[in-house]
Structure formats: structure tokens, C-alpha cells
Regions:
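N-terminal lobe/hinge region of extracytoplasmic solute-binding protein
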Residues: 34-88, 124, 199-202
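Mature extracytoplasmic/periplasmic domains
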Residues: 361-381, 554-560
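A structural signal for short loop-to-beta-strand junctions that line the ligand-binding cleft
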Residues: 56-58, 84, 146-148, 204-209, ...
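Extracytoplasmic/periplasmic ligand-capture domains
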Residues: 1-20, 24, 70-72, 91-92, ...
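Surface-exposed binding/hinge segments that line
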Residues: 96, 132-187, 356
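Acidic glycine-/aspartate-rich tracts in secreted/extracellular proteins
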Residues: 41-43, 100-101, 164-165
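Residue-level recognition of beta-strand termini and adjacent short loop/turns
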Residues: 87-89, 151-153, 213
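Long beta-strand-rich cores associated with HINT superfamily self-processing modules
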Residues: 558-585
Length: 585
């Protein structure tokens, strides 16, 4: 879907206050089951193969498991892994695996118990270094972190780091983060690739009872007690229903057709929180503008091609205003593009976006990956709303760039240019609040005289352009680390370097970010990591590569008449977590 933006969206007329807040109805859902409405369009089909993009959230809903969990103090808790050791030179790791964990029995097939061989298989299948055709959501992240995992015996895994990251155990193999699910190698070997693509064989406390493609799936408590008693489900059966339209989710909760729903803030404000309870995994999703196409590294930073020249950069073929091409479009092209990116950043009224689209319940974001409520935030990296200044800044540049179909009758005259902004997949993509933020940004840019379009086609179509480093559209996304729950000192920028070539990217690459990412990742203590994170903040703000817009609360609301309690464990990369904690009345 392409929409032409011709003016800033008017602040939506404040919804009339209802005479009374919405109170809890008697639910019409079956007894003994919790029905949850989720947003998005990515429910897909049952899929138990990481390289075929099995759902990342299986480890969060309790269908699958991974190596570690997150403790309340942000340290790691053992899960499938019992412990680990790191080589003194940070070159490798050894991980010990819990023994005796039974896999789920699927269609009458018993695949035995989990060993280190299943763990190694699952990671290697997901990692694009070992499985180049992998489309796992973190295929590129894994490629940037480590090579092949080896099962030395049934309880021992070893691997070498390609680039050590001190948070590997807190993020990439942790339920809280962007981890992988452990699946059965025996199921793959015995039943074949096609079979496991349609059947999940994992070790979680729940297993799939029914999965209707792009509609819903139902999970049921496995027979017997779970091997980890604290994960034993409090509810026998849970159904997840995909409802992409936010207002429809609110309507279903209001009428009692679902017991819990993901609500956008403007809808949640209408519900009586004496009758409904908010629950979340602790995060808000930061939506910002990532200026793709700025590919400033010249050689591969890691992997089999390390040190070799990169292929020709398609994003530099045309002189695009916000893309700086070193030496290709004039000596001042880098500086000129930087100024244009700043102009586009200060043309956005972040407070208006928060007030209008998020009912004032979100938070303004100035620089993606950084939370302005953190004690580390100094206020020195803010983008003021200054449309007049944006016009002046663009007019001060040499208009030798490609202008597309932009008209000349606005405030920018001959300096006007055409720009499209893509709505990324977060929170449901173009049909959700993400699409509304894209529309708003396009509108603000239109106000200063740019010809703008908002793009809302499927992420499956868009993703190859960021993997292949060919995208030139600014896009609205949280891009890997844009979550309020991620600690300040966590390494940032991996997916803004050539370390993830062959996998996901924000769309730009920088040797400065490469250096700062490595310093954060290899830091021996939190203070050193924080210092490098602060330098990263200085750099991306000065270069205007990822100006933020707004952080969207990512919460669920449940009907107290049906659900007794549902405390979620904290998670940085999931909004629905630890379903074993859900308890019915």
C-alpha cells in the first residue's frame, strides 16, 4: 500500500469521553481456556525449523525453550543451559546442557530427550554462517557473533566467537532477547525437513494442539509435570487469535469474545482498570526513522570474506539527498546529506505524535536505542521541533541531488525532493500504529515542502532489501534494539555493520559504529560498556542516522472476571511472555 502524504495529519479530534468507562462483561469464551487476541500479521503456520523462520516467540509462549531466562535483576537464570565458561582471551565459550529433558510427543512420535546435539543443530540451522539459506529472524545476528556450534558430547557445547559480545547470554540465547528455539535433531533426521517445517517438536511446558494458518493456534499443557517445576502451567489450555485491527481487538475484549487483548494506548484509555488489568513484559517499542542506504564500510568486517572488498553499493548509484556517498557525488556529499537528515529530523513534532496517536501515554524518543527516562540521559541529544529551521537548513545546501517528482511551488522551491517512508513490521506493521507514525512523519515532511509517500507493503517483500543492502527508503522501525527495556550499556549497532552481511540490517553501515559496537561488546565491565554506548549516542546523533519519534507502550489487558492473574517475566524482545504464569479465576 502506498499513500501520498500532502499535509501533516490533523491532530485527531479527541475522542469524546464515554459517559462511563468500559466495564468487564461476562465472557463468552469456553470454560477452562484463556483466549488472547494479539496484533500483527505474522502468526503464520506451525513451523518447527529455525532456518525456515519458525516463530521467534515459541520460547516466550512456552512451546519451546532456549538456554537462559532473565532474572528480576537482569542477570541470567539457567534454563536448558546449566552454566558456561568463557576463554580468558574471549575467543570461545563452553556451555553445559541440562540432561533428561523430554521432547514433546507429536503425532504419536516420541523423539526422546534433549542433548547438546539438539542445541548445536538448532543454532547451526538458524545461523546464516552455517546455513546460508536461513531466514531465521536473527540469522545475521548469529553470523556476526559466532561460527559453528559443536556438541562435544551429550552435555557440552563449544563455539568460537566471531565477535565477542558480553551480553550474548542475556540476549541471543535468552528468553528475554532475540534468541533461538531448541528443536529436536532426531525429528529432523527421522522425519525430514518438510515434516518439521509443519510440526513443532520442542521441550516447553505447552505444546501445539491446533494451528490454523494466519488465524489462531491453541496450546495445551503437556501430560505430566514439566521438568522445571516453576514453569508448570497454571492454565490447561490457551488460544492465541490473530486480530490485526486494533479497534477490533478492543471490541472483542469489550464484548467478552476474548479474555485478553493487546490494546493500543488510545483504546486502553477507554477501559475501567478496576475491571481490567494491564500486564506487559516491561517494554515499550521505540519507533524512529532509520536513514537506509548510507553504506560507509568498504570491506567485510568478519566472516569468510573478512578483509575482502564489498560488492558495488547499489544505494550510491543515484545522488539521493539523505544518503552520503563518500567521493561519488562531490566532496561535500557526506556533510550535505548529514544536514538534510537533520532537517528531516527536526521537521517532526514528536510531542504531537505522542499526544495524537498514543493518547499521551507513550514517550518521546529523540535517538533510537536510548531511553530519555534513563539517568544516563543528559538532554544534549534532543531534536527540537523546528520546521522553519528545517527549511533553512535544506535551502543552505547545494541542490545537486536527485529531486524526483517534487514540485517547486512550496517553501523549498528548487530544493524540494521526493521521499518515501516505509512502515516497518513492529506492532503489526503498516496496518497498526507503526503505519500511523509513518503517515505522520510523511505529513511533517510534506509540511516543509517535500513530496512524500508512506509505504505499507508486506515486510516479507521489504526485508530482502535490507538483507541485500539495497534499500534507500527511510523506514519507521525499532531496528533490533529499539526497546525501552534494553539496558543502556547493552551493545548496539551490530546490525549497522558488515558483520551481519547476509542477514538483517538497519540499512546503513559505518566503520565508526563497527568500532564502537566492538568496544561495547568486548567491555570487561558495565562502566566501560556505558562509556562506549555514550560515544555511540554522540555519533549517531551527530550523523542524524536514527532520529527517534515515539515509544509505544506494548501492553495487554485482561478481563478480571475470567483471568485471575498473569504476571509476565520481563522481556526485551517480546510483548507476550511466560504464558505458564497465566491463571484463570
Amino acid at each position: 500500500v502506498t499513500e501520498v502524504a500532502t499535509a501533516t495529519p490533523e491532530a485527531a479530534a479527541a475522542a469524546e469521553e464515554p459517559e462511563e468507562l468500559i466495564t468487564a462483561p461476562d465472557t463468552t469464551t469456553p470454560a477452562g481456556i484463556a483466549v488472547i487476541a494479539v496484533g500483527g500479521t505474522g502468526l503464520g503456520s506451525q513451523n518447527g525449523l529455525g532456518s525456515a523462520q519458525a516463530p521467534d516467540g515459541l520460547k516466550n509462549t512456552g512451546i519451546a525453550e532456549t538456554l537462559f531466562r532473565r532474572a528480576a535483576d537482569d542477570s541470567e537464570l539457567p534454563w536448558i543451559a546449566t552454566g558456561f565458561t568463557i576463554a580468558p582471551d574471549l575467543s570461545s565459550a563452553t556451555v553445559k546442557i541440562q540432561q533428561g529433558i523430554p521432547f514433546q510427543v507429536v503425532d504419536g512420535n516420541d523423539f526422546g530427550t534433549l542433548t547438546a546435539h539438539d542445541v548445536a543443530f538448532s543454532m547451526n540451522d538458524a545461523n546464516s554462517v552455517t546455513t546460508p539459506e536461513s531466514i531465521h529472524g536473527q540469522a545475521g545476528d548469529f553470523a556476526g557473533l559466532w561460527g559453528e556450534w559443536t556438541a562435544v558430547d551429550d552435555e557440552t557445547i563449544t563455539f568460537d566467537f566471531a565477535a565477542f559480545d558480553s551480553t550474548w547470554k542475556d540476549d541471543y540465547v535468552n528468553q528475554s532477547g532475540q534468541a533461538f528455539n531448541v528443536f529436536s535433531k532426531k525429528a529432523f533426521d527421522d522425519m525430514g525437513k518438510d515434516w518439521v517445517r509443519d510440526h513443532i517438536v520442542a521441550t516447553g511446558p505447552f505444546q501445539v494442539e491446533e494451528w490454523l494458518r494466519d488465524e489462531s493456534y491453541t496450546i495445551v499443557n503437556r501430560p505430566g509435570e514439566h521438568w522445571l517445576p516453576e514453569l508448570e502451567p497454571k492454565t490447561e489450555r490457551i488460544q492465541i487469535v490473530q486480530v490485526s485491527e486494533p479497534t477490533t481487538r478492543a471490541a472483542l475484549l469489550r464484548t467478552g469474545e476474548v479474555d485478553m487483548a493487546a490494546l493500543e494506548p488510545k483504546d486502553a484509555a477507554k477501559f475501567d482498570l478496576n475491571d481490567f488489568t494491564q500486564t506487559s513484559a516491561g517494554g515499550a517499542v521505540q519507533l524512529g526513522v532509520f536513514f537506509a542506504g548510507n553504506l560507509w564500510e568498504d570491506t567485510y568486517a568478519g566472516g569468510a570474506n573478512e578483509g575482502n572488498p564489498l560488492p558495488t553499493k547499489a544505494t550510491f548509484v543515484h545522488d539521493i539527498p539523505w544518503i552520503g556517498s563518500p567521493g561519488k557525488h562531490g566532496d561535500d556529499d557526506l556533510e550535505q546529506a548529514k544536514h538534510i537528515r537533520r532537517a528531516m529530523a527536526i521537521a517532526i513534532d514528536r510531542d504531537l505524535v505522542n499526544d495524537t496517536l498514543v493518547a499521551g501515554l507513550g514517550d518521546v524518543v529523540h535517538v533510537e536505542y536510548f531511553n530519555a527516562s534513563s539517568p544516563n540521559w543528559t538532554g544534549e541529544h534532543e531534536y527540537p521541533y523546528d520546521p522553519d529551521g528545517a527549511v533553512e537548513l535544506i535551502l543552505a545546501q547545494d541542490n545537486d541531488y536527485q529531486r524526483g517528482s517534487a514540485g517547486k511551488d512550496g517553501p523549498l522551491g528548487e530544493h524540494a525532493f521526493e521521499v518515501s517512508v516505509y512502515a516497518g513490521p513492529e506492532l503489526g506493521g503498516g496496518g497498526s500504529i507503526t503505519g500511523e507514525v509513518a503517515d505522520a512523519v510523511a505529513g511533517f515532511w510534506s509540511d516543509i515542502g517535500l513530496t512524500t509517500f508512506s509505504l505499507k507493503f508486506s515486510y516479507q517483500t521489504f526485508r530482502p532489501t535490507v538483507v541485500g543492502r539495497s534499500n534507500t527508503h527511510p523506514w519507521i522501525t525499532s531496528c533490533d534494539k529499539g526497546k525501552a527495556a534494553i539496558p543502556w550499556h547493552f551493545p548496539k549497532g551490530l546490525v549497522q555493520t558488515t558483520l551481519t552481511r547476509g542477514g538483517f540490517s538497519c540499512g546503513f553501515e559505518s566503520p565508526v559504529i563497527l568500532d564502537l559496537y566492538r568496544r561495547m561488546a568486548e567491555a570487561s565491565d558495565q562502566a566501560s560498556a556505558t562509556a562506549a554506548a555514550n560515544e555511540y549516542l554522540d555519533y549517531v546523533y551527530e550523523q542524524n542516522l536514527q532520529p527517534g519519534v515515539v515509544a509505544i507502550p506494548d501492553a495487554f489487558y485482561f478481563n478480571n472476571k475470567k483471568i485471575k492473574s498473569f504476571p509476565m517475566d520481563k522481556a526485551a524482545a517480546a510483548n507476550l511472555n511466560s504464558l505458564w504464569n497465566l491463571e484463570l479465576q
